[in-house]
Each structure stands twice: as structure tokens, then as C-alpha cells.
Amino acid sequence: MNHLNEIKMNSEIIISVYKTSISPKDVCRLTPVLDNFTKISNWNIDLKDWENILRVESQFSVENNIIGMLNNLNIVCIELH
């Protein structure tokens, strides 16, 4: 096993879940922001949920970054615990 595979196997994925005010229109401007944030490995938005849930997967703690990025776009974002 090479060193990179060993790191990947030992890395924990942190899943953060947020209640948001994301609308379908917001998704277009939010997508490049989240896609280009290199610390995020995966993300999705459930617009069918009344809380417009944003789910983020990362190997890093990104909660403050996510909340700040969405707030800068005038989107309400509250982490759910």
C-alpha cells in the first residue's frame, strides 16, 4: 500500500448539515463557489425539504467557511447539530 492510499484510509469524512434559505435561483450562483472550495469533497442541496438542507462532506472542519460564504451571498445558513 502506498503512502497516499494509507492517508486516504485513515482520513475521516466530516459531514456538516445546514438549514438554509437557498432557492433554486441561488443554486446557479452557489454551485461554482462550492465546487471551487477545495476542502469540500462532496455537497448537495435538498430543495424539497422545507429547511433547504445543504449537506457538505469534507476531511476538514469547514463549518465557519460555509456559513461565511453563504452569508456573503445573502443566504441564511445555520449549522444543524
Where are these regions (language model features)?
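Short glycine-/aliphatic-rich beta-strand segments at the starts of folded cytosolic domains
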Residues: 5-22
